[in-house]
Amino acid sequence: LERNTKLNSDTIPFPARHLLPMENYIMAQESHGYSNGRWTSMISSRGCPYGCTFCASRKTRWVSRSATDVADEIEYCIEKWDIREFHFEDDNMTINVKRLIEICDEIKRRKLDITWQTPNGIRASRIDEEMLRAMKESGCEHVTLAPESGSPRVLEDIIQKGKDFDLDHLRDCGATAHKLGLKVAAYFVLGLPGETRKDMEMTISYARQLAKVGVDEVNFGLFIPLPATPLWEPSKHKIKDMDWLDLLTVGDLAKAVSFTDEVG
């Protein structure tokens, strides 16, 4: 299909949930986020302009939906299936702070009785107290931050997180979110190529700092090399026959192969 660079994302139909056995999905409670009831996933934007070297969504065009369109889909899910919990799976929901606050305002304006969360993570460099407060007031219960590492060297030289990323600011964001009554999680990646034992110890130490300021949960994931990313080196990583199932974090590759000399 020819790529339409002038596509208005608001013209794209809502996901065809009506073609799925929605009650089965709702009752299974197999969500990416923390499900407490009748839930569904949602995407308010696609893409991420940042260049994290391990990420499948790096440097992709960011396209967003309007606050009105997002609220329309929420309202539709309420009316059709009585869904009251929404898990936003955007690659980077906080690129446009003004738009995110507009979504929060639209949810409040329509008096939509919902809860929502960001299990895919939001970028701390775009967060401030005004945004977190707007999220909380519109029903957000849980935010996930993605520091990836507690080592400045890893963030700058290996992950290439971006010059605007600051670990101290992320810690402050976690403290502010906790103060406002939000549940907070933080994601880290271990085992990156070139990562040392000292780097990993710094990450663990930083995770403890987050816990002290009120972050409720920290998650450590293993690095998995993905095709078309800068860290994809099949020969170096001893990948002979590529099977996409092996590239999932739940696959055998994650258990059998280490991508740094510091971890067995």
Question: For each of these PLM feature ranges, what is it?
Answer:
Residues 2, 12, 100, 130-131, ...:
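Short aromatic-enriched loop/helix-cap "lid" or pocket-rim segments at secondary-structure transitions
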Residues 89-96, 120-121, 190-194, 220-231:
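Short, solvent-exposed turn/loop segments enriched in Gly/Ser/Thr/Pro and often Arg
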Residues 124-126, 194-200:
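Active-site glycine- and acidic-residue-rich loops that bind
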